[in-house]
């Protein structure tokens, strides 16, 4: 058996081709941790119907950003950078909740290396049962079914880690540098939305998001900022305000320069590359903004990788 520790990065994943869009959506809508559609025994059937209906418009969006999600390559780049920072004694792997490499495939790869100790590190900074909770539940299911004996430590949040906050602030400064020095720029944090019912039932996601924003904005004294939520879908009540609503509100109040900061995302994927860079950018143009920009995503930011390394080292103590 190897004395090394496996670091397993948990991420949602994304389709790696246009043909993968529909099966990816089936996997997503089949997950009862994220959405409950009817009785459990019917959900896989209903998920297939929803995925079939939504596949074509979603495929068009992926076609506009290169025909696939970049999230696998970016997560693997994060894993490689993290392994280099951690040095000997660690091997990094990735597990995607709704696509490949699956949790089953990741554990098989760890097992082939003869590693028995795992630090499962969620790449969702803000805990929610719909994101980290789902990935952890899937990992526990696969572990139970495998019959393998692993010593697993879970890192399920890092919304207030100093280096994560510093990494976000660095990217915001890069975004602000794209504006004229004398321009009055406001900041709009845009986080992935969540049904309000999750928060009402005690999910800490919203409080984690708000604390991240507070800590980041301590570094930008005097700058006006807002928080909104994107990517909502379906008829249930979602977190408010929506990003579209805030864009319209700010335009109506004569805001002309806006920097959008993707929050709750640590790498580029469809929500940044299409929803923000294309859809919201077009809306901002129609609403009359003089300049609308997005701060760069964390991806392999050295500060962010240092944050992950610190989380791993502390989990391994």
Swiss-Prot record:
This is Ferrochelatase. Pathway: Porphyrin-containing compound metabolism; protoheme biosynthesis; protoheme from protoporphyrin-IX: step 1/1. It is an enzyme of class 4 (lyase). GO terms for biological process: heme biosynthetic process. One of its GO terms (cellular component) is cytoplasm. Disulfide bonds: none annotated. InterPro entries: Ferrochelatase (IPR001015), Ferrochelatase_AS (IPR019772), Ferrochelatase_C (IPR033644), Ferrochelatase_N (IPR033659). Keywords: Cytoplasm, Heme biosynthesis, Iron, Lyase, Metal-binding, Porphyrin biosynthesis. NCBIfam families: hemH.
